[in-house]
Amino acid sequence: MSTARTENPVLMGMSSQNGQLRGPLKPSAGPGGGGTQTQQINQLKNASTINSGSQQQAQSMSSVIKPGDDWKKTLKLPPKDLRIKTSDVTSTKGNEFEDYCLKRELLMGIFEMGWEKPSPIQEESIPIALSGRDILARAKNGTGKSGAYLIPLLERLDLKKDCIQAMVIVPTRELALQVSQICIQVSKHMGGVKVMATTGGTNLRDDIMRLDDTVHVVIATPGRILDLIKKGVAKVDHIQMIVLDEADKLLSQDFVQIMEDIIITLPKNRQILLYSATFPLSVQKFMTSHLQKPYEINLMEELTLKGVTQYYAYVTERQKVHCLNTLFSRLQINQSIIFCNSSQRVELLAKKISQLGYSCFYIHAKMRQEHRNRVFHDFRNGLCRNLVCTDLFTRGIDIQAVNVVINFDFPKLAETYLHRIGRSGRFGHLGLAINLITYDDRFNLKSIEEQLGTEIKPIPSSIDKSLYVAEYHSESGEDKP
């Protein structure tokens, strides 16, 4: 099925839910979410109530599960994911999550997330992180990095202590909410793990009040957590682990001084875990200064995901919208993300797409945080098929229903391109990346191909659906008749 369309395209009004210009809403086969979008945001906002009911649940569960019982029979497992997966996540050593001697309650949360076996980055990271050693890990986007650090982080928590014991720092507010949600879900059987998400753009007073209650894990953006530390409300003197997710961005010029200021407030015996797809010189410098004999993991024989097929279409600026319209009508889009190079172009393009009759949300950094949160959760829950955005949405955002990424504006940097196309083909699945290239972009195209060691091919007149549509494959990878 191609993208949902109306017979008489009109510009739809502003949604009362998220203030987006959009055409008719057609629920796609997006990833399921627990509860409504509003419920999810409230859950992430209220650290004092997060998992507060889990203690009773875990206690009742543990009273049922006895040594020798087949405890896996009690699990509420999600439907098995039968989509084909690439070697980015299947090329493992054959380990099982049980091999790491994890708490049974943590294993229950892992399996109920649908995580059947550890991915390569999880196999490499989990035992080392459990030993307390610093880690410098380089792995592709969408290969399970969040699980690689959240599993050992949760295993090492001591719930008898009512203090912050672990901190995860991420570069964007949306990624903080996403990681928080994963942490909450994985730890739901552990009996009272308190997770707090704190980001800029939200009420500082609310965060201060929530820190009066017990918090074990903080997921934060750099500026907000430093502010809370300086005010003396975020007590970090008992932190045993700090994780820098998307470390290359966190240690760029935008954040590096803030990160330095955060690190010096932590205990000297803290464990530092760095995860990223790219490691520029700034990361190497930080590693030399702050990591103690780190265990280095490099799973990057190539930079781009194996499951993402890349094409370019040579167009003039005036032809871009027409080309996009053609792609919408010919591609079998589950969900798509469309990138522009400025906030203004994002809004203009979203308006154009809505006028063409396609359902469309947009998101960029200049929007109010409340609207950004709503758009993120609505799109994640499959309420809209297409999302137009800036590079705000390139970092770590994991929406596995996205099978098509379109660079309406081609990026100038190879790093930006790498993170953009990594929004499709998540966790070893198949995806498509299409780049609209103008005359002025041709040198950037060649440069990015050379830097990433990849080939971006001219778009064919017809694209084989088996390259990006999961239904055309069985689990064994054989094409369906």
UniProtKB/Swiss-Prot annotation:
Coiled-coil regions, chain positions: none
Residue span(s) of domain Helicase ATP-binding: 126-297
UniProt biased composition (Low complexity): 52-63
Motif (Q motif): 95-123
Primary site of residence: cytoplasm
InterPro entries xrefs: DEAD/DEAH_box_helicase_dom, Helicase_ATP-bd, Helicase_C-like, P-loop_NTPase, RNA-helicase_DEAD-box_CS, RNA_helicase_DEAD_Q_motif
Reactions catalysed: ATP + H2O = ADP + phosphate + H(+)
One Gene Ontology CC term in the entry: cytoplasm
Start and end residues of each Helicase C-terminal domain: 307-467
Binding-site residues, ATP: A139, K140, N141, G142, T143, G144, K145, S146
Keyword Transcription: no
Superkingdom, natural source: Eukaryota
Keywords carried by this UniProt record: ATP-binding, Cytoplasm, Developmental protein, Helicase, Hydrolase, Nucleotide-binding, Nucleus, Ribonucleoprotein, RNA-binding
Residue numbers covered by motif DEAD box: 245-248
Regions of compositional bias (Polar residues) in chain numbering: 41-51
UniProt-annotated location(s): Cytoplasm, P-body; Cytoplasm; Nucleus
GO MF entries: ATP binding; ATP hydrolysis activity; RNA binding; RNA helicase activity
Family to which the UniProt record says this protein belongs: Belongs to the DEAD box helicase family. DDX6/DHH1 subfamily.
UniProt name for this protein: Probable ATP-dependent RNA helicase ddx6
Source organism of the structure: Xenopus tropicalis (Western clawed frog)
